[in-house]
Amino acid sequence: MSSRVILVSDDRSSLRSPGTLLWPDSACMRGIHTNDWAAHIFEYAMSFEGDMTQVRELAAQTGAGVLHPHGALAVEPPGLIVCDVDSTVTRTEAIDLLAECAGKAEEVSEITARAMAGELDFAESLHERVKCLEGLHVGALEEARKATVVTPGAAELVAAAHEVGAAVGLVSGGFTALVNPLAAEIGADFSASNELEIVDDHLTGRVVGDIVDRAAKATWLRRWAEKSEVDLERTIAVGDGANDLDMFAAAGLAIAFCAKPVAVEAARNTIRCERIDALRAVWER
């Protein structure tokens, strides 16, 4: 079966060095050049026989990302893309924005960092962080929503996915009050996140219902794939931290986006530039 290896970056010069390892055995090389990012796509009649570890290491040194779609995704577009939200589809962390409103920024930020690095159980850390928000007026949710910084290219990614018939889902350990409006803003088809309990217009410091944690993210990916009638091998999972590893394992292709080392190691596919629509290079022909 034919295969492809893709180099992607917002700095075209960073593609040259790793490209020298890919060019000699490729049947052809094509380029995608936009105002914001570039990709070099190397096509192979069969599987790439070179040393992918060496390619990834050299790309990391230059700041380029490496995408190596396999199976169905090597020859056809995805049917479903599922993205983490905080620090993936957004450049901000929802809980940190709310913590600033509550005057608990430093305390909550420390817990968040440890959780995303895999040092703390997510469910326990979520409860600890949300407890810090007890008594916060519901108006802070709108403040946090307005302060949310959407990752460049998010809406463009959704539009590009829809053009090839793929659905897009947002799954987050964050909160429905922020994730649902974001999904509507960028045109995503599905969303799942945690719901904050509110009584008398104030946060109680608790969440309602099942927690969207590491395992739940994979469950939602499978659920949306089934609803969309898409084989799992035609799904893509995109994330940045330890909480994304289960959905990485469930998807046909896992992509670590501007990610922490634990996610990069698990996904083996990377985008290092802050243009999330660069992942459309996976299916560009």
State each model region's role.
Residues E128-C132:
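Long, charge-rich alpha-helical interaction segments
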